[in-house]
Amino acid sequence: MLSPVEVDLEAYDISRVSGFLPDKCPLRKLPDPYYVPWERLTAHLEPLIRAKRLQHELDQMPVLGITRLTSQPMRRRAYVLLSFLAQAYLWGEDIPNTTLPQAIAKPLTEVSTLLEIKPFATFAAFCLWSFSVHFDDDIGGDCHKFLDNMSMTCSFTGTTDEAWFFNVSTAIEARGGRIIPSILNAISAVQNNDMLTVEGFLLDFTICLRDLCDLIDRMHENCRPSVFYHRIRPFLSGTSNNNPATENSKGVFYVQAEDGTGEWHRYSGGSNAQSSLIQLFDITLGINHDIGYKTRYLREMRSYMPAQHRRFLARMEEISNLRPYALSHGPGSSNMCSLYNSAVLGLKNLRDKHMALVFRYIIIPRAKEKAGNGLAIRQKDLVGTGGTDMIPFLRETRDDTMNAVHLPYS
């Protein structure tokens, strides 16, 4: 078995300075004029949606091939464009569409196959591959400066609220990603029984988690709950059984040929559960989500991640060793127990912050909407964009994290 220090992050498409984010800005525009139809329509999503002309324009769009996408950055840009066009087509009218036209479905399926990712709008489309800053050095720099200077390369609504919502998640990826090399060093230190290095890592990890909580706390600065709930969130929807708009259908039909043939597909909507970073934190601390549906859901969300990132998570599961090492140290022998507990509590606090966002941006606006219509909120109304029953899932994953804190403090 390879030593953890020999894990080649570059082979897993992971940056030492920005983690799962590319350490250079994604393309803002495809350089080949052949792809102008994709770029032009994506650049005008908001006015076309507002005028209810988007579906008509996309129905007239030519079917473009992907052979001119000769680099990974170009393929990622194409995937982002087509994902935004697909979501706008499906959810941009008063009545959701259940058919995706060939001009979107065919190239989206083909480029997704090359990228080894679902042919649907994922966390990667919304955050990892669609941000922009003026200078690449900002990506690995101060996370708050990165957040303040970031912009989106695509938008459904053209609002600051939408940009800020996605940018906060992207800034979390940038700040959290910097801890990945330290995780590998800590795993190696465990193998060498280097307690000081492990303790130093746990302290740094706790600080990192605190920084991520601070970033979440900034969501309210530029993202209003009413705008998120009514204007942004619909475009994050999936086509799974838990989506009321598609629960009585087979999902969405992807037209693949001029004769109208194709296939039905069901996919979960874009969700932070598709962030490789948070699952990596669970793996690092040995957090066990042992109830069947949670494990199945989190595993399913890995299939929505970029291929190399999910392979990295599988590799980390093989070599992760921090929790048993912490368990092996009694409170009188070192600070290991208290430092490990502090890191676990830091992850628990991060989940608390996320749950508070869900209440503020989804549960409360939905309750107000229901009350305005003289209706009571029901459990089926509390389904997340990823297709889960939000509150039970978030509470249980938070409680799973808290349950890991059973080591005695020194």
Swiss-Prot record:
InterPro entries: Indolamine_dOase (IPR000898), Trp/Indoleamine_2_3_dOase-like (IPR037217)
Keyword Signal set for record: no
Binding annotation for heme: 309
Molecular function via GO: heme binding; indoleamine 2,3-dioxygenase activity; metal ion binding
Protein's pathway: Secondary metabolite biosynthesis
GO cellular component: cytoplasm
Keyword Oxidoreductase: yes
Catalytic activity, as annotated: D-tryptophan + O2 = N-formyl-D-kynurenine; L-tryptophan + O2 = N-formyl-L-kynurenine
Required co-factors: heme
Key words of the record: Dioxygenase, Heme, Iron, Metal-binding, Oxidoreductase
Alphabetized PANTHER family for the sequence: INDOLEAMINE 2,3-DIOXYGENASE
UniProt family annotation: Belongs to the indoleamine 2,3-dioxygenase family.
Function of the molecule: Indoleamine 2,3-dioxygenase; part of the gene cluster that mediates the biosynthesis of the benzazepine alkaloid nanangelenin A which contains an unprecedented 3,4-dihydro-1-benzazepine-2,5-dione-N-prenyl-N-acetoxy-anthranilamide scaffold. The first step of nanangelenin biosynthesis is catalyzed by the indoleamine 2,3-dioxygenase nanC which produces N-formyl-kynurenine through the catabolism of tryptophan. The two-module NRPS nanA then utilizes anthranilate (Ant) and L-kynurenine (L-Kyn) to assemble the dipeptide product nanangelenin B.
Protein name: Indoleamine 2,3-dioxygenase nanC
Annotated gene: nanC
